[in-house]
């Protein structure tokens, strides 16, 4: 494809040599100086690009959505600010400034003179008029208009399949003090109301859906159609990508973004671009290629990325007729794309996509299939209906919705209950299906199952007393006979949060009320040994005592179980 042609002669870089950026980008480094950009654009003019097929390999490594998507910052209007500053300091014509930014586009689309002229005319008019609005400076106005876009890594691209050239998820804080925006408290309140009952995903989706219905949020799909309003949004989005993907040459971002074969789905808050995804649909092949993606930093972790991707999926399916998305991801991006429904296995036939997307060294090709029936922009309603249906079915089979008053359960110092509460006295237990034969259920087969519960409990207490005595009489039991004194070991209880010792175990055994199963007794003994090994290093006497005593204890437990089985 022409938008992915290697028009910039940048050296290939492996992902291991790149420094991870908060923008989830793994692309080549940005040419920072104006001279380099013009030189790269001149070089691009000499490169031959195929109209329908991508070159065999790309000089840029695959860009990605990194794991720090939600924390990445992406600013906007950075490029426009520099243009404005140059215009203020020099006598250069605004057209010249625009040529600097859209150099690659002019070379690539030289036959399309109307596109070039419209971009230059639009930018010149915008730069000339921006300085007089509300008495603000040109730079301030431009910052407000092209605030950055960020994309969350929460939900993602099930839309389909082509390689990601400059995918980045993140954004800069832009325009947080702009008048006319709804206070953030309202969104927070809506999320708080729905979070407990609906879950985080549904709460965010429904909150953003309400903002859409109220007209505060708008999702649009624009391309380079020479309409001023659309071009303003695209330039704002371009600045987001440029800031979000610092290793990606700005000329390359402009080239893909302004390519008329690419489309950009954007989320707007008022007239401010908040986020966007640029992709190229291959209608004849029924798959799409995501190129860039970003959301402003101050709007992250609010569900914008999820909502944006859902709109992209629905638009790609309903308007473009796509069934898949493909994308190249680096190591930082794989986790994000998995959350968006992408898989590492490519099920789409290779003949469908091979030759249409670029191959990247070190990138992992991932695929996402677009469901033909899912209402992507109304998933929260569908999930709520499904959850309601499941709850109603559960209520038909269970009385779990009944909540009974709590019971009073007081304990002594060793955790021994002051008052014995019979299990059958616990309200709702029988209604839940409990039966008396389940009392004292244990994975250890101790005694005759035909004996009554009282007899079994007496036999259990006798076994636990015998096991306790074997531990107390063992030569390695001395570190465990008393609780650890915090005056001798000040930090012990900072490290060991659930201490236990033979003295506490003895009190619980003698009460004949605490250990109702052998499992509970064995669990306390194991915790005592594990606490010792957690605090002490392996070369200490305490660590070795714990290991030897534990071995002795387990051998006695097995012997007791075997003798009990023989007595039956």
Curated annotation (Swiss-Prot):
Domain N-acetyltransferase span(s) in chain numbering: 222-371
Biased composition (Acidic residues): 90-115
Biased composition (Polar residues): 1-12, 128-151
Catalytic activity: L-lysyl-[protein] + acetyl-CoA = N(6)-acetyl-L-lysyl-[protein] + CoA + H(+)
Residues binding acetyl-CoA, per UniProt: 293-295, 300-306, 332-335
Subcellular localization(s) per the UniProt record: Nucleus
Presence of keyword DNA-binding: no
SUBUNIT field: Interacts in vitro with ADA2a, ADA2b and the transcriptional activator DREB1B/CBF1. Interacts with PP2C1. Binds to EML.
Other remarks on this protein: Mutations in HAG1 suppress the tpl-1 phenotype showing a transformation during embryogenesis of the shoot pole into a second root pole.
Name of the protein described by the UniProt record: Histone acetyltransferase GCN5
Name of the gene this protein is made from: HAG1
């Amino acid at each position: 494809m022409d938008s992915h042609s290697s028009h910039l002669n940048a050296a290939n870089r492996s992902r291991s040599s790149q420094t991870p950026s908060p923008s989830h980008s793994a692309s080549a480094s940005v040419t920072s100086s104006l001279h380099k950009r013009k030189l790269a654009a001149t070089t691009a003019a000499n490169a031959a690009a195929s109209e329908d097929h991508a070159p065999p390999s790309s000089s840029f490594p695959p860009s990605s959505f990194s794991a720090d998507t939600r924390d990445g910052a992406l600013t906007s209007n950075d490029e426009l600010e520099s243009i404005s500053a140059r215009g203020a300091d020099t006598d250069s014509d605004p057209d010249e400034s625009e040529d600097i930014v859209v150099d690659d586009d002019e070379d690539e689309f030289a036959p399309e003179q109307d596109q070039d002229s419209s971009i230059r005319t639009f930018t010149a008019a915008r730069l000339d008029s921006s300085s007089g609005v509300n008495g603000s400076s040109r730079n301030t106005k431009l910052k407000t208009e092209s605030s950055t876009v960020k994309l969350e890594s929460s939900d993602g691209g099930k839309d389909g399949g082509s390689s990601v050239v400059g995918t980045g998820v993140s954004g800069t804080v832009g325009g947080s003090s702009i008048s006319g925006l709804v206070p953030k408290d309202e969104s927070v309140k809506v999320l708080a109301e729905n979070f407990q009952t609906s879950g985080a995903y549904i709460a965010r989706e429904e909150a953003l859906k309400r903002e859409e219905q109220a007209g505060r949020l708008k999702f649009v799909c624009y391309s380079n159609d020479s309409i001023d309003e659309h071009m303003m949004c695209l330039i704002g989005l371009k600045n987001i990508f440029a800031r979000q993907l610092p290793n990606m040459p700005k000329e390359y971002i402009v080239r893909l973004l302004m390519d008329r074969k690419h489309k950009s789905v954007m989320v707007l808050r008022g007239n401010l671009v908040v986020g966007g995804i640029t992709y190229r649909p291959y209608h004849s092949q029924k798959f799409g290629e995501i190129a860039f993606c970003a959301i402003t930093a101050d709007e992250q972790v609010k569900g914008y990325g999820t909502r944006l991707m859902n709109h992209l999926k629905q638009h790609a399916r309903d308007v473009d007729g796509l069934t898949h998305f493909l994308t190249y991801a680096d190591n930082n991006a794989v986790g994000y794309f998995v959350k968006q429904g992408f898989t590492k296995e490519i099920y789409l036939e290779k003949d469908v996509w091979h030759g249409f997307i670029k191959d990247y060294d070190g990138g992992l090709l991932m695929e996402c299939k677009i469901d033909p029936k899912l209402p992507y922009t109304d998933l929260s309603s569908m999930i709520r209906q499904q959850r309601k249906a499941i709850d109603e079915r559960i209520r038909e089979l269970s009385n779990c919705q009944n909540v009974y008053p709590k019971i009073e359960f007081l304990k002594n110092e060793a955790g021994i209950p002051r008052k014995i509460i019979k299990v059958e006295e616990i309200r709702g237990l029988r209604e839940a299906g409990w039966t008396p034969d389940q009392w004292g259920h244990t994975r250890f087969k101790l005694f005759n199952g035909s004996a009554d519960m009282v007899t079994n409990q007496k036999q259990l207490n006798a076994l636990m007393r015998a096991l306790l005595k074997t531990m107390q009489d063992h030569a390695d039991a001395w570190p465990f006979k008393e609780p650890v004194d915090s005056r001798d070991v000040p930090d012990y209880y900072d490290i060991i949060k659930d201490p236990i010792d033979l003295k506490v175990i003895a009190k619980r055994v003698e009460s004949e009320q605490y250990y109702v199963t052998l499992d509970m007794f064995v669990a306390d003994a194991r915790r005592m040994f594990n606490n010792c090994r957690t605090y002490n290093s392996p070369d200490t006497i305490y660590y070795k005592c714990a290991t030897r005593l534990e071995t002795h204890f387990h051998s006695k437990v097995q012997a007791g179980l075997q003798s009990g089985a023989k007595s039956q």
